[in-house]
């Protein structure tokens, strides 16, 4: 057994490319070794901006032998009556490269046939691996790649060297004009000389560490966090937590060195988000806060190298930030010269979408939709504030600050609203209507912000789909999936019992002046299908797919209600008696469907002949009122517990009663009994879609 080590050294790879490339390397090498029949131990990747490396421990010295069996014609066609090979047999043997005497008889699902077993002897690992590694590096995919000057080889950035070692012995691997060897290189400035490697992962990591390269991202992250903690103390505070920035900086440096810098205190008069955004998004600096979380006029930059005089690096970082903050202060002061209300009409000169009009049109429609949603929820008292918040929600798009810092849209509008003395709830709604930005981000804080946020997303979703634009495959240029997920997260989190169909119709009302690409009814159905698809995708990440399908089939117009039904059903499925319950109710639903699905649920007690059907009616009458009351209260766990008490009576009914009796009166009566049972659970879930079996003892009984 020997360790395989493979490193690709390159010019600086963009930070966002490195994590994905390392995952690809690890997954692809493990699969390639398995496909090549080379046994191995741990496969792991490490990397920095200048190198991507992967290793496999304990690689077998040779491939395992491969046995393959090829089947030919039926025996009856392969041999004549005297047992001599026919042309069919000799032709098959020739096609397989063997003598006809090597053919054997084999039983197959298609009868007895002639066959040949071939053994491919395994080759030595060093014969197999060079081509395997060339495919590995050539198969790496990046969002953008550069082509070699001399051939068709591509990579994220020009490849400068490669290392390919098996048990310390070099393998010859080519990519473009680069051929692998056994030397790597340390830090570009601190240790640029060639480093000879022995070929083990531990030797590789140790030698690079001495050459100022922490190749393992886990080790480098620990070093980065330690540097940030040290620098925070030096700055008389602590570094503001920012996991996303840590992850980004992690792949910008090979050995992190933190540098503390300072900016003018007067810049703390700017909104904190402006200063933080300038530092993190434009310069990759970490903000420093005091013990109460307030921003200090200090920052921490992470350098990719060490300089003899740290003051030189510090002054460079400070100079760049000073200029950027001066620009921010200028935009802030200029923006404050005009009130938000004075900027509303400016939105009319800013296009939202060519077929949907201006941002002013958008703001007015958002207000109309938000007001309709509020009335549907019985929150009429919010309408005036909703209209005001909707008018102002997009106004900051025309400010200099948002032009310079697009990521602060909403945030700046809220700051300006507070500075102008507008109602705090309005200011919060301006900021919150962009939330949630991502699938796990925070939600709006109030009904005001939540309703404007939902209305904004509904307008985009219905409007964009309405004019014929859609999300297809991985492409979603208008963020429709994100909008749909945002709607669902807000509605469920705030417990809004909204009809999605009605909300879509209200949005179409607001879009009445827009020319739709299809009929209104078709657009509405397309939007609802899109929303249902997002519901299904989101819920199947947490719940069993069959339960999700069962609940959605029973109705998903009110997603809050559907989510509660799903949670109750998931809890019920975890109980040992659920299989019997699901099977019994599935039979009820199937019989109802076969009988036509509709019809009277009336039951005439005088027509009940068997004890089992009488017992079932008695059990029904005992629980029906309780189920109705529990269902009205949306207490679905209680509904399921109560309905579950019917399972023994339903099981006895099916064991002893023929529902589809020849007597029409008996048949109709028994179908009516089934419909009454189905009425208790049919609006909870379609049990026919649930994958469940009765326990073995129940089936045996």
Swiss-Prot record:
It is an enzyme of class 6 (ligase). The keyword Membrane does not apply. It catalyses: tRNA(Gly) + glycine + ATP = glycyl-tRNA(Gly) + AMP + diphosphate. It comes from the Bacteria. Signal peptide: none annotated. Keywords: Aminoacyl-tRNA synthetase, ATP-binding, Cytoplasm, Ligase, Nucleotide-binding, Protein biosynthesis. It is found in: Cytoplasm. GO terms for cellular component: cytosol. SMART domains: DALR_1. One of its GO terms (biological process) is glycyl-tRNA aminoacylation. GO terms for molecular function: arginine-tRNA ligase activity; ATP binding; glycine-tRNA ligase activity. Its EC number is 6.1.1.14. InterPro entries: DALR_anticod-bd, Gly-tRNA-synth_bsu, Gly-tRNA-synth_heterodimer. HAMAP family: Gly_tRNA_synth_beta (MF_00255). Tetramer of two alpha and two beta subunits. This is Glycine--tRNA ligase beta subunit.
């Amino acid at each position: 057994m020997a360790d395989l080590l493979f490193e690709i050294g390159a010019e600086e790879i963009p930070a966002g490319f490195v994590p994905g490339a390392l995952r690809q390397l690890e997954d692809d090498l493990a699969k390639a070794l398995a496909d090549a029949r080379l046994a191995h131990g741990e496969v792991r990747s490490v990397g920095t901006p200048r190198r991507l490396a992967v290793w496999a421990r304990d690689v077998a010295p040779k491939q395992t032998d491969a046995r393959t069996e090829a089947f030919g014609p039926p025996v009856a066609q392969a041999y004549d009556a005297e047992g001599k090979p026919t042309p069919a047999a000799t032709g098959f043997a020739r096609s397989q490269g063997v003598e006809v005497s090597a053919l054997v008889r084999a039983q197959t699902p298609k009868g007895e046939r002639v066959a040949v077993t071939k053994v491919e002897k395994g080759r030595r690992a060093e014969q197999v691996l060079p081509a395997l590694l060339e495919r590995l590096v050539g198969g790496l995919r990046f969002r953008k790649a550069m082509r070699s000057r001399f051939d068709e080889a591509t990579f994220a950035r020009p490849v400068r060297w490669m290392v390919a070692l098996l048990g310390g012995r070099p393998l010859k691997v080519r990519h473009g004009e680069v051929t692998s060897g056994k030397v790597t290189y340390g830090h570009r400035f601190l240790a640029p000389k060639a480093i000879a490697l022995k070929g083990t992962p531990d030797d590789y990591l140790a030698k690079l560490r001495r050459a100022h390269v922490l190749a393992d991202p886990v080790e480098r992250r620990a070093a980065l966090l330690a540097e940030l903690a040290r620098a925070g103390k030096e700055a008389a505070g602590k570094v503001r937590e920012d996991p996303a920035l840590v992850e980004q900086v992690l792949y910008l440096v090979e050995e992190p060195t933190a540098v503390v810098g300072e900016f003018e205190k007067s810049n703390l008069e700017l909104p904190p988000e402006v200063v933080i955004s300038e530092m993190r998004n434009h310069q990759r600096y970490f903000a420093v806060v005091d013990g109460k979380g307030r921003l200090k006029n200090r920052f921490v930059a992470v350098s990719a190298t060490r300089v003899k005089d740290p003051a030189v690096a510090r002054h460079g970082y400070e100079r760049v930030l000073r200029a950027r903050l001066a620009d921010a202060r200028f935009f802030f002061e200029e923006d404050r010269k005009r009130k938000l209300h004075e900027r509303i009409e400016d939105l009319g000169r800013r296009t939202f979408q060519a077929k949907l009009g201006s941002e002013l049109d958008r703001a007015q429609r958002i207000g109309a939709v938000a007001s309709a949603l509020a009335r549907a929820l019985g929150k009429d008292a919010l309408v005036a504030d909703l209209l005001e918040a909707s008018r102002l929600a997009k106004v900051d798009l025309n400010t200099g600050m948002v032009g310079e810092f697009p990521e602060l849209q909403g945030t700046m509008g809220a700051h300006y609203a507070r500075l102008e003395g507008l109602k705090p709830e309005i200011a919060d709604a301006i900021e919150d209507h962009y939330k949630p930005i991502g699938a796990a981000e925070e939600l709006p804080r109030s009904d005001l912000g939540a309703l404007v946020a939902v209305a904004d997303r509904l307008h985009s979703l219905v409007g964009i789909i309405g004019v014929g634009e859609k999300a297809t495959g991985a492409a979603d240029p208008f963020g429709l999936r994100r909008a749909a997920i945002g709607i669902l997260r807000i509605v469920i989190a705030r417990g809004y019992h909204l009809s999605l169909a009605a909300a879509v119709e209200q949005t179409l009302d607001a879009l009445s002046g827009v020319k739709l690409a299809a009929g209104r009814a078709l657009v509405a159905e397309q939007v609802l299908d899109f929303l249902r698809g997002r519901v299904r995708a989101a819920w199947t990440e947490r719940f069993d797919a069959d339960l999700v399908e069962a609940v959605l089939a029973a109705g998903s117009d009110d997603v809050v209600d559907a989510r509660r039904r799903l949670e109750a059903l998931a809890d019920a499925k975890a109980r040992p008696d659920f299989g019997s319950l699901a099977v019994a109710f599935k039979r009820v639903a199937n019989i109802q469907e076969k009988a036509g699905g509709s019809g009277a649920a009336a039951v005439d007690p005088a027509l009940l002949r068997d004890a089992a059907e009488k017992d079932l009616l008695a059990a029904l009458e005992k629980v029906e009122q309780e189920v109705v009351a529990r269902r009205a209260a949306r207490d679905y766990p209680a509904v399921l517990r109560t309905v579950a008490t019917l399972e023994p009576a339903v099981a006895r009914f099916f064991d002893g009663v023929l529902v589809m009796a020849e007597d029409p009166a008996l048949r109709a009566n028994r179908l009516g009994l089934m419909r009454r049972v189905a009425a208790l659970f049919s609006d909870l879930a379609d049990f026919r879609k649930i994958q469940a079996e009765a326990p073995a003892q129940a089936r045996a009984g």
